[in-house]
Amino acid sequence: MASRQPEVPPALAPSGPLSKMSLPIGMCRRAFSYDDALEDPAPMTPPPSDMGSIPWKPVIPERKYQHLDKTEEGAASVSSLAVTPSTATDSSDKAPVVKAKATHIIMNSLITKQTQESIQRFEQQAGLRDAGYTPHKGLTTEETKYLRVAEALHKLKLQSGETTREEKHPASAQSSPSSTPHSSPKQKSRGWFPSGSSTALPAPNPHSMDPGGGNDRNSADKWSLFGPRPLQKSDSGFAIQAYKGAPKPSPMEVMRAQATRAGEDPAVFKPPKMDVPVVEGKKQPPRTHNLKPRDLNVLTPTGF
């Protein structure tokens, strides 16, 4: 602590080309020795004595957004001017809170306005705007500019499929159903295969198929375009049944068939033998190493 130099107030600090970088107001320049601070049990950097006088928060002028206050919230300012002086003096203590709130609202509206204007600028550059758009009679052009963005968002939502039930099924103008499918209130869903009983193929007459008797009436009624067809008796005496294709063997049957086939003819499943010609000749003797002590320097790794 003894090696520290006395603190120099910023007002008396040397100001000139030889002086160091000027410190902000309230910061004191001191020559600090870290070796002394390590031996000293006291805190390394004690807080300055004039802690309360240091301006920590930035100073914001009160009426910075005065012109914005007039343009954005004209009605609110007019109503506040119309207040009697007695109430104004009573509410003087609440003035800072009201100012902060108004500033917050103004900043929000400013940000919104800038965002909308940048969106419109981009739309104009990209050619996304309708050229023949005219604003509504009761609205000013400024308001319709911002309404246009919400309108475009709504169109985007409709395109992405977020339609309501009323939009999906529009109510029919006609109260009674007509023959045309477009104007009828209930639209039939069209598929590949007809599902109604009226559109299904008519069942064959059992008497035309079987003139002998009416025992097969139930089986003939069950006959349809899809599903298993029962046996139909014909005059020629042959039984007519739907061909469903050859029965597919189960994998166990396939494995059994392969095993029996391999047992019957084992030569089929043997891999072909490769005939490698052996070159007959004298085998070369293994080479002996003729190493001399000086050659060991080359073979030794560098770490040794």
Curated annotation (Swiss-Prot):
**Originating organism:** Rattus norvegicus
Q: Which keywords annotate this record?
A: Cytoplasm, NADP, Oxidoreductase, Phosphoprotein
Q: Short name of one Pfam family for this protein?
A: P33MONOX
Query: What Enzyme Commission number does this protein have?
Result: 1.-.-.-
Q: Which Gene Ontology CC terms are recorded?
A: cytoplasm
Where composition is biased (Low complexity), the residues are 171-186
Q: Which residues carry this modification: Phosphothreonine?
A: T45
Determine if Membrane is one of this entry's keywords: no
The name this protein carries in UniProt is: Putative monooxygenase p33MONOX
The ranges of region (Disordered) come to 1-22, 38-57, 69-96, 159-231, 262-304
Q: Partners and quaternary state?
A: Interacts with NELFB, NOL12 and PRNP.
Q: Would you identify the family this protein belongs to, as annotated?
A: Belongs to the P33MONOX family.
Query: Among its keywords, does the record have Transmembrane?
Result: no
Q: What is its main location?
A: cytoplasm
